[in-house]
Regions:
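N-terminal pre-triad scaffold of radical SAM enzymes
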Residues: 3-30
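A generic structural signal for alpha->beta connector loops
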Residues: 1, 102, 128-129, 154
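Conserved Radical SAM active-site core
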Residues: 2-7, 18, 36-107, 113-120
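Flexible, glycine-rich phosphate/dinucleotide-binding loops
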Residues: 13, 114, 141
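P-loop/Walker A phosphate-binding loop and immediately adjacent motor/lid segment at beta-alpha junctions
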Residues: 85-93, 97, 142-163
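Structural recognition of alpha->loop->beta junctions
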Residues: 56-60, 64, 118-141
Length: 163
């Protein structure tokens, strides 16, 4: 089940332009030096299926603004969710595509895109997004000065769908 920790906006740290960031609960990577350790636990936040109206209302309020470029999934890790959680994230992506077709969608994850099984639900979610920031944070490769939107040099920005 997907749990939402927070929705932050306006946000300029988690993708190009001014964005809305959806923070999901839960991560199994537990990267040493992680900036978002507060998001690791799965038993915190609002259960998406029980708070959909509230979550969609807040997202709509921000995504309807012309100056907001899109939505970012962060956390935690959007890919470190059970099947129900991934399905909920896919529902959110489909909702954004339907209601705000000009907005782009970024997703941060600790996995490498090419390591995901081709027909997996995780890869399907990634393919629904426009930009993936992939790879675990590696403290010994920290270089925030030269890695926009990333914390370490092993992380990559992949443009999956151009918007």
């Amino acid at each position: 089940m997907l749990r939402i920790l927070d929705i932050t906006a306006p946000d300029i740290n988690n993708g190009n332009g001014i964005r809305v960031t959806l923070w999901v609960a839960g991560c199994t990577h537990h990267c040493k030096g992680c900036h978002n350790q507060w998001t690791w636990k799965y038993d915190q936040g609002k259960i998406f299926n029980e708070h959909k109206d509230e979550i969609y209302s807040k997202l709509s309020d921000w995504l309807s603004r012309d100056y907001v470029e899109g939505l970012t999934f962060s956390g935690g890790d959007p890919l470190c969710q059970d099947i129900d959680g991934i399905n909920s994230e896919m529902e959110i992506v489909e909702w954004v595509r339907k209601n705000f077709p000009t907005k782009n969608i970024w997703l941060f994850c600790g996995d490498y895109y090419n390591d995901l099984p081709e027909n997996s639900i995780k890869k399907t979610l990634c393919n629904m997004c426009d930009v993936i920031v992939e790879g675990p944070y590696e403290e010994d490769k920290r270089d925030i000065a030269h890695c926009p939107f990333r914390g370490s040099t092993n992380q990559n920005i992949l443009y999956i769908n151009k918007k």
